[in-house]
Amino acid sequence: MARRSQSSSQGDNPLAPGYLPPHYKEYYRLAVDALTEGGPEAYNRFLASEGAPDFLCPEELEHVSRHLQPPQYVAREPPEGTPSDVDMDGSSGTYWPVNSDQAVPELDLGWPLTFGFQGTEVTTLVQPPPPDSPSIKDEARRMIRSAQQVVAVVMDMFTDVDLLSEVLEAAARRVPVYILLDEMNAQHFLDMADKCRVNLHHVDFLRVRTVAGPTYYCRTGKSFKGHLKEKFLLVDCAVVMSGSYSFMWSFEKIHRSLAHVFQGELVSSFDEEFRILFAQSEPLVPSAGALARMDAYALAPYSGAGPLVGVPGVGAPTPFSFPKRAHLLFPPPREEGLGFPSFLDPDRHFLSAFRREELQRMPGGALEPHTGLRPLARPTEAGPFGELAGPRGFFQSRHLEMDAFKRHSYATPDGAGAVENFAAARQVSRQTFLSHGDDFRFQTSHFQRDQLYQQHYQWDPQFAPARPQGLFEKLRAGRPGFADPDDFALGAGHRFPELGADVHQRLEYVPSSASREVRHGSDPAFGPSPRGLEPSGASRPNLGQRFPCQATLRQGLDTASEAEPERRGGPEGRAGLRHWRLASYLSGCHGDGGEEGLPMEAEACEDEVLAPGGRDLLPSAFRTPAAFPAKGPKPGSGSGGGDSSEREGPEETSLAKQDSFRSRLNPLIQRSSRLRSSLIFASQAEGAVGTAAATTEKVQLMHKEQTVSETLGPSGEAVRSSASAKVAELLEKYKGPARDPGGAGGAVTSSSHSKAVVSQAWREEVVAPGGAGTERRSLESCLLDLRDSFAQQLHQEAERHPGAASLTAAQLLDTLGGTDRLPSRFLSAQGRSLSPQGRDSPPPEGLGTHQLPYSEPKGNPTPAYPERKGSPTPAYPERKGSPTPAYPERKGSPTPAYPERKGSPTQAYPERKGSPTSGFPNRRGSPTTGLMEQKGSPTSTYPDRRGSPVPPVPERRGSPVPPVPERRGSLTFAGESSKTGPTEEVSSGPMEVLRKGSLRLRQLLSPKNERRGEDEGSFPTPQENGQPESPRRPSLSRGDSTEAAAEERGSRVRLASATANALYSSNLRDDTKAILEQISAHGQKHRGVPAPGPAHSSPDVGRPTTAGDLAPDMSDKDKCSAIFRSDSLGTQGRLSRTLPGSAEERDRLLRRMESMRKEKRVYSRFEVFCKKDEAGSSGAGDNLADEDTRDSKMGKFVPKILGTFKSKK
């Protein structure tokens, strides 16, 4: 009995009523074999011998003869001598297909899911149409125009240009269009596109493939295929038009045809049929000539575009590169070089090199791995990321269609196989839809594509998406730039560069820059963050999506910071950055590029200007990485930073990171101005990071080191002898002294840059074990000269304006001491405003000199200040030394602030921040209440700064706290004489505006113009305080050991930290600053203004003043400040009592501010309130609990108070 496989009628009952006898006849097969082997003659002979009728018409005979294909493996055919009926492999191609595991192409543009229908409806259309019925062509056009999800066309012949226009319009609307053409007639379609100058390769939402009829295999292995005679148009999987109508002009005009329009459940059968046909389809193959011309053209869609512009023949006209002349079909204007531009994806050309080209849809069998394949792939081998040999577009898309990849497609490691039937596909689609919900509402789940990625791309698994991605999901997600279906097509190459195997995939957890900094800090020394932000932002919801941007390395702040040093290293760059910062501060600009409102960020930038190494939020001093040492020598690199970093090494870096982390986490980071943020928060951060105790300890340690290695210089300053100690001490000295001189040398802004370079060199020299002594001597001599000139100027000032002169001295000292501490941005401003003082006007020099004595103990200050005088660089360079030279110097230098900063970047930095107010003012003895207020109330720092005409200067100093500006401002203010004038002149632009603004605020705050006099008087008074400071500085430098100076600075640092904390905890606004200034002004007013004048007037301003000396003119607070300056440790003790700690100081400040605000409800009572605040400042600790509440209230009253002041004025 015949086996089932041998009997087509097995199981059929011949006796059944509906039995249909088989029609198969053996002679049919034998006759066809004879035809294929011997031609028509053999065919006729066989029929004659069998006595059978001719069952083939002439057309069929011609078709078979014309399309007969030899066996695929010709080499295996038997030699001519062997019998033709013997198969070399012993099997027939009919039963043993060569490519049984051929991959199934996917519907890469998406396919809508349909689960139910609203009913079934069938409409019959005929051609030519009846009078009242639409024609088949019109109905087809209407259907295509209404498409929203998909247009699927199966046609034997497609040469109607009108219908082609409709299809292209749909594709231009981003409606996926699939066209399946008869393989044998596809050339006609290509010819039509060529005539219309339509480049099918650049219509993203169009897929044209070919389908052949069933293949008939002969016993010899020869075969021939039939035509695709199915004709239907499927729209949105909801409506189908099917019939005998072909998309040809003749069918509209001369042929009779029939078509039906189906809606409802019947559409599902066409849906399934189309999927089956598409799975069996092959890429569209152009003519041999066109293919040859396109070998080098695939990635160069048209002349002048794409990476292969230079490839020979690219510019030659081809069927797919049309001349630039008016379009035949669509008159509307279009883009040059592309036919039907209105139908193209708008961003298609921008990344055409990564687009899937129509050539990719050409049959892999035809192209195979020969000529056309490699030329196309070569251009992409060097992708932007060099990950893969070109975008996945060509190889990955094509390899499914190449014989080399067609085997074993079902034997995937995970056992997953391509979907074999429509039912299974539908089931998977349903499951996917249910699991993903709306994401796949308009998209067929491309489970095939997903599995194919796994199956066929196992060779590069990184390209396998976690879940299918389709056009509609992409579009619905609204991801501009990725809406191109080619990006999702399995066979289509991404228009965008592919991710390399070395690039992390999106599936991996990519920590944000913030989290990275939290874990590792933002120090550039740790290298760039693993991935950038930020351009990509949060990870895409579709983890499976592999867009190059997702894994693109980000140019993080850290990475940029490494380049920053050299880019902005120059003084000009720093000055520019400072100016910009000042401008932003004035304009109320607050968002920093990356770290929104982070105070340290702004400061880091400022410092960065000086020392690019520290790009992060941390001050450059903290951020000084290993790179800094190398860059240290460079003026732009920030010698101070380099030295500090060299000395401190990675330890410092780690500290810097911690500091950055703290500041980043700072909840109060968001401020109204970048400047204010940097000032307040830098000081706050410093205070937070390093406690006053830590600062004091560091200062003491530094002092000890200084004592050990220090020698007295000509100026009386302690000069370090030991190399390492010298380096640290010198740096510290430079920082402290440099700052002091910097404060005086308002010219530091511009010249300070140059000076910074010089001072950096000096510092480096000093750092060098051998040259330190010599450099110190020269610096000392310079300092002495400066001091002398300063004393002379002081005398002159005293004679002209006794109070002003004194004030000037104190202010100069303050300025000199605080310049370096000013934030770099203010340094520039300060330099502009003070340059006249420091450079142009002798008084500034005097100031610088006066301060120099103080700074001399540091040792570095001498060179710094002289440099400043001689060359703008020295004082500033120290700052320059590191983006925050002052910081680095602090670190490197024994000065408590700096060392502390090193020891605890936070303290050091806070010190720096607070120092402008507490530390620096005290040290500086700035006439401005900055000093006194520092002691009395950190608040005064701000008032001073405000009061000072050159508020930017303090900022410039690098210390976020305005106190530095206060000193400068005080200096300029108190010495409204020539100094003030030059300062104002110099501080043009932002600086001028700031200075004027602060003055105006003071005036507003002070109901009487008497306020100004008061301020001037106050300045002298602060000078008294400052003067004692100044003398103490000199005495510290000369009489007192460097230790004293260091301790003094440490205490100042404490004050600064406290002030910073206070300022930080209190959400200071401009109004708050005004209040602080008012408080400081009152404090100054009530302190003995006269005394400071004489002290400063006398050339001996440098001599230390005792608490008793200060007592007469100064309040206890002021005395404390003075004593603090004069007695290093004793001063610290006083400070501790006055400001038991940063917390105490902060509490005091907050208390004063709160009381001020409460009392400021009525402007007329403002002075009284200020007095009360001053009086209550000593007991600030008692009101700590109320500070928060008061602080919260400040915001409410300050605006009103300010408004009142303005209206009254």
Swiss-Prot record:
Subcellular location per the Swiss-Prot or TrEMBL entry: Cytoplasm, Cytoskeleton; Cytoplasm
Assembly notes: Directly interacts (via DUF1669) with casein kinase isoforms CSNK1A1, CSNK1A1L, CSNK1D and CSNK1E. Interaction with CSNK1A1 recruits CSNK1A1 to keratin filaments. Interacts with KRT18 and probably other keratins.
Keyword annotations: Biomineralization, Cytoplasm, Cytoskeleton, Phosphoprotein
GO BP: biomineral tissue development; intermediate filament cytoskeleton organization; positive regulation of cell migration; protein localization to cytoskeleton
Region of interest called DUF1669, as start-end residue ranges on this chain: 1-286
Residues recorded with modification Phosphothreonine: 749, 873, 917, 928, 1072
Pfam families named in the record: SACK1
Chain positions with Phosphoserine modification: 512-513, 515, 522, 639, 660, 752, 778, 806, 871, 882, 893, 904, 915, 926, 937, 948, 959, 970, 977, 1035, 1041, 1057, 1080, 1098, 1177
Region ranges (Mediates interaction with CSNK1A1 and is required for FAM83H activity in keratin cytoskeleton organization): 1-286
Molecular functions per Gene Ontology: keratin filament binding
Compositional bias per record (Polar residues), positions renumbered to this chain: 915-942
Organism: Mus musculus (Mouse)
Comment on protein domains: All members of the FAM83 family of proteins share a conserved N-terminal DUF1669 (domain of unknown function 1669) domain of about 300 amino acids. This domain mediates the interaction with casein kinase 1 (CK1) isoforms. Therefore, it has been proposed to rename DUF1669 the polypeptide anchor of CK1 domain.
Expressed in which tissues: Expressed in tooth follicle, eye, liver and kidney.
Residues covered by region (Disordered): 512-545, 615-664, 735-760, 829-1056, 1076-1147, 1174-1193
Protein name: Protein FAM83H
Gene Ontology cellular-component terms listed: cytoplasm; cytoskeleton
Principal subcellular localization: cytoplasm
UniProt family annotation: Belongs to the FAM83 family.
Role noted for this protein: May play a major role in the structural organization and calcification of developing enamel. May play a role in keratin cytoskeleton disassembly by recruiting CSNK1A1 to keratin filaments. Thereby, it may regulate epithelial cell migration.
Gene that this polypeptide is encoded by: Fam83h
Statement: the UniProt record of this protein carries the keyword Phosphoprotein: yes
CDD domains named in the record: PLDc_FAM83H_N
